[in-house]
Every structure is written in structure tokens, then in C-alpha cells.
């Protein structure tokens, strides 16, 4: 009987072992006991009593939202009222703060401002990139002492008669002019008394048909225009200096003739300047 009461599970608290006297030759193994009178339970006032009223206050009064998916356990989401939703008021423009007003009217203005900011930023970045690239390339260029000793070789067969061709030499424009016979005779016939900077034509050339000059005006350093001016030679558009076909100043504010660089002919059609 005791073993049955022990294995009764949840019914064990309400079961008890008793014995009764049965007439027989054997003496009872267990003395009969009188069940004790149960004491009245004492309630703990600090613990909440589980009643219908207390449980009804904890019950969910709103509809539940259940989510079920494949390979995931089912879950129930209760409604939360303590979540603060950001409104991004500080990041929005004044034209679109009013949710009841259409933002299409201010769309063009807002797009124009965005395009303007993008264009200005692009120009600034391009200018900064240009400076960086320029400095990087300049660092790989030849030094000043190397440029000072630089020479340039010119093929004279590429310059037709009566034409002037410009080159770059030591950072300056270099004019090479193939003169006609008429120009040679006219420049040789000029009297030195008519010149501001007297110099004979034959003193400025090694071959009469070739004139080699540095294309920098002796007034303020502008670059003259070839085959222009009152004397058919060179004309400075900055302040109106006129040079003849030999590079001598004839009219205007320039004080000196165009400079003749050092050069030598290494062949009939090849000249080396420098």
C-alpha cells in the first residue's frame, strides 16, 4: 500500500496509508493510526494571490499578431507603445516638412540646388586634382640646369619659302623664317640710320635665307605675330611694336631688336639651336 501511494504521482498528497484490524491468528504489522486534524493554512500577504481578478488584469486585451514561417518557430508579437519613431526633422528641408502639402512644386528648386552643389564640388575636386597631377609631372621634368644646356635640332626642309615656323626652346618660343629673295634684298638695303637699334641684316643671319629669332617682344615680353605689321615681319599685338623680316624694331615702344639665339648649321637642311 505504501509503494502504491509513493508511485501515485500527483495524487500522492491526497492519499495516506491506513490499516484496519482484521480478525485472524496473526498480529497486525502496523498499528492503526488516527489521521491528524489538518491545520488551517496561513496566507502570505506579500505574495499576490492568484485569483480571477488578478489574472484578468494580466491578460492580453488586444488582438495578437502571430508570424509563422518555414524552418522557423512560430512567434507572437505584442504591440509595443514605448518605441520612439524618429521623424528626421533636423535633416529634412523646410519645403517638405508639411506632410499635407505636395512637394512637387518645390521639386525643381531643390533639384537645382543639389545640381549646383554637385557642380561646384566637381569643379573644386577637378582643380585640386589638376594641381596635384601638374606638380607630380613637374617633379619628373628636367631640372633648370639641364634645360639651360638643352639643344633643339630643326629640319629646315619642312619650312616652305616665305613661311615662319614656331618651336619651343628653353621654355621660349623660337621663330625660324625661310625668307624669299625679295625679303633678303629689302632687308639688306635698309640704312642703319633708320633703325632704333642699328644692326645690319648680314650681322643677324648666317645664311641669308634663314632667320632664327627668339619670339619674345623686347618691350614687355609678349609673343609677336609672324608675317604681320607694317614691315611684313613681326607684329606685337600687346602694344603695337613692328619688326621687319630680320627681327629689327622699326616702329612701336620696343627698344631693342628681337634676340638671335646661338645656333649652327650641321647640314644643308639641319640647324641646331643652343
UniProtKB/Swiss-Prot annotation:
Which superkingdom, per the lineage?
A: Eukaryota
Cofactor or coenzyme needed: [2Fe-2S] cluster
SS bond list = 222-238
Matching CDD domains: Rieske_cytochrome_bc1
Its localization reads: Mitochondrion inner membrane
Query: How does this chain sit within the bilayer?
Result: Single-pass membrane protein
Give the reaction(s) catalysed: a quinol + 2 Fe(III)-[cytochrome c](out) = a quinone + 2 Fe(II)-[cytochrome c](out) + 2 H(+)(out)
InterPro entries per UniProt: bc1_Rieske_TM_sf, Globular_prot_asu/bsu, Rieske_2Fe-2S, Rieske_2Fe-2S_sf, Rieske_Fe-S_prot, Rieske_Fe-S_prot_C, Rieske_TM, Ubiquinol_cyt_c_Rdtase_Fe-S-su
Record-listed [2Fe-2S] cluster binding positions = 217, 219, 236, 239, 241
Entry's transmembrane regions: 104-140
EC class, as a word, reads translocase
- Any one GO molecular function term: ubiquinol-cytochrome-c reductase activity
SUPFAM superfamilies referenced in this protein's UniProt entry, alphabetically: ISP domain, ISP transmembrane anchor, Non-globular alpha+beta subunits of globular proteins
Q: Name one GO cellular component term.
A: mitochondrial inner membrane
Ranges per topology, Mitochondrial intermembrane: 141-274
Q: How is it modified after translation?
A: Proteolytic processing is necessary for the correct insertion of UQCRFS1 in the complex III dimer. Several fragments are generated during UQCRFS1 insertion, most probably due to the endogenous matrix-processing peptidase (MPP) activity of the 2 core protein subunits UQCRC1/QCR1 and UQCRC2/QCR2, which are homologous to the 2 mitochondrial-processing peptidase (MPP) subunits beta-MPP and alpha-MPP respectively. The action of the protease is also necessary for the clearance of the UQCRFS1 fragments.
Q: Which ranges make up the Mitochondrial matrix topological domains here?
A: 79-103
Q: Tell me the keywords, alphabetical order.
A: 2Fe-2S, Disulfide bond, Electron transport, Iron, Iron-sulfur, Membrane, Metal-binding, Mitochondrion, Mitochondrion inner membrane, Respiratory chain, Transit peptide, Translocase, Transmembrane, Transmembrane helix, Transport
- Which protein, by its recorded name, is this? Cytochrome b-c1 complex subunit Rieske, mitochondrial
Protein encoded by which gene? UQCRFS1
Amino acid at each position: 500500500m505504501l509503494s502504491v501511494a509513493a508511485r501515485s504521482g500527483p495524487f500522492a498528497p491526497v492519499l495516506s496509508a491506513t490499516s484496519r484490524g482484521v480478525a485472524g491468528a496473526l498480529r497486525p504489522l502496523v498499528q492503526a493510526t488516527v489521521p491528524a486534524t489538518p491545520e488551517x493554512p496561513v496566507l502570505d500577504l506579500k505574495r499576490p494571490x492568484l485569483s480571477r481578478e488578478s489574472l484578468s488584469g494580466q491578460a492580453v486585451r488586444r488582438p495578437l499578431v502571430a508570424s509563422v514561417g518555414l524552418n522557423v518557430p512560430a512567434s507572437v508579437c505584442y504591440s509595443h507603445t514605448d518605441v520612439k519613431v524618429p521623424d528626421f526633422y533636423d535633416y529634412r528641408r523646410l519645403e517638405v516638412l508639411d506632410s499635407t502639402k505636395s512637394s512637387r512644386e518645390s521639386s525643381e528648386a531643390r533639384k537645382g540646388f543639389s545640381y549646383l552643389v554637385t557642380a561646384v564640388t566637381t569643379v573644386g575636386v577637378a582643380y585640386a586634382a589638376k594641381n596635384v597631377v601638374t606638380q607630380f609631372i613637374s617633379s619628373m621634368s628636367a631640372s633648370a640646369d639641364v634645360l639651360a644646356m638643352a639643344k633643339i635640332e630643326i629640319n629646315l626642309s619642312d619650312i616652305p619659302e616665305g613661311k615662319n615656323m614656331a618651336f619651343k626652346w628653353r621654355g621660349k618660343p623660337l621663330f625660324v623664317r625661310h625668307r624669299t629673295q625679295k625679303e633678303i634684298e629689302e632687308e639688306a638695303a635698309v640704312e642703319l640710320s633708320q633703325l632704333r637699334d642699328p644692326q645690319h641684316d648680314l650681322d643677324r643671319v648666317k645664311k641669308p635665307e634663314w632667320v632664327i629669332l627668339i619670339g619674345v617682344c623686347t618691350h614687355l615680353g609678349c609673343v609677336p605675330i609672324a608675317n604681320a605689321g607694317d614691315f611684313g615681319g613681326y607684329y606685337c599685338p600687346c602694344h603695337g611694336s613692328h619688326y621687319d623680316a630680320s627681327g629689327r624694331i622699326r616702329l612701336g615702344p620696343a627698344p631693342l631688336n628681337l634676340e638671335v639665339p646661338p645656333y649652327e648649321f650641321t647640314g644643308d637642311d639641319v640647324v641646331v639651336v643652343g
